[in-house]
Structures are given as C-alpha cells and as structure tokens.
Amino acid sequence: MPDELRAEKSFPSKPYDSLKNKSEFDRVYQKGFKKHNPFFSLFVLDLSQEPPKEKAGFKDPLFCRLKDKKTLYLLGLSVSKKVGNAVKRNLIKRRLRSLTLKHAALCQGLALVFVPRSDCYHLDFWALEKHFLEMLTSIKNYMNKALKDLKKGITHTYAKQ
C-alpha cells in the first residue's frame, strides 16, 4: 500500500501516563500531599522535586517516564466497588481523566492519585471540576510553602524531606 494512502494516527497522544503497579501508588500515598473532601481524596507527589531513587543499575520508573517520553504527568485512579456498579465507576474515571486533560498545565510534573467516594457519582462535571481545581491549587500552594520552608531549613510536619 502506498504511503500516501495510509491513514495517520487519528487520536493525538495523551499527555499523561498511568501509574502501573502497587509500588508506584504506595509511593504517592506515602510521600505525597493529601487533600480530602466529601467527594474524593487527592494524593499529589511533585516528581520534579522528588529525587530519583536509583539502586545498583535500576532506574526510578516514575522519574524515567516523565523524562523519557512526552508525558506531562502521571495519573492513578483508584475507584472502589463501593462507589457503584461498573457503569458508574467508569463514568467517574472518564470524568476524572477528562478533567486532568483539560487542566494538563496545572498537573505538569505531578503524580496524581484520585480516590473517589460514593457521593462523587452524583456530581455533575462542572461541580467536580470546581472541587478538583480547589483541591489542586490548595495542594500546590501547600507544596510551594513546604519547599520554601525546607530551603530555609525549617521543618514542619507538612515539609516532607
């Protein structure tokens, strides 16, 4: 088949990659900043400030995926069966992916994990977007304050080393 007749990729590449295994999720849960509201919990790890952990020839998978590809951020969705049936869970996941795509510039260099609660299904997209933006800007302000304090040598409970 001639090259002129071949179809190009119809979908643009997504700007995020997903968290793949339990160890990656656990790292975000343990070292990241957390924020909760009645609809979902958001865990955020700033990968640009996080030094890559390297052991005898092993590269850090989280850090490498951001540096090697054109990936802006990493996304993890942990939707429990308590939230609802498969249709409801998939709707929530589609909405959360769409939110992060819409606000990819805010998510750049971060590893995000969403843990929706059962009330999340009843929110429309715009209310979910409002809560997401409030939480993400709050966490980013918190992380900036913690980073400034660490540079000054002040350690608080929120300034993680």
Curated annotation (Swiss-Prot):
Keywords: Endonuclease, Hydrolase, Nuclease, RNA-binding, tRNA processing. Pfam families: Ribonuclease_P. It catalyses: Endonucleolytic cleavage of RNA, removing 5'-extranucleotides from tRNA precursor. One of its GO terms (cellular component) is ribonuclease P complex. Coiled coil: none annotated. GO terms for biological process: tRNA 3'-end processing; tRNA 5'-leader removal. It comes from the Bacteria. The keyword Transmembrane does not apply. PROSITE patterns: RIBONUCLEASE_P. One of its GO terms (molecular function) is 3'-tRNA processing endoribonuclease activity. Belongs to the RnpA family. RNaseP catalyzes the removal of the 5'-leader sequence from pre-tRNA to produce the mature 5'-terminus. It can also cleave other RNA substrates such as 4.5S RNA. The protein component plays an auxiliary but essential role in vivo by binding to the 5'-leader sequence and broadening the substrate specificity of the ribozyme. This is Ribonuclease P protein component.
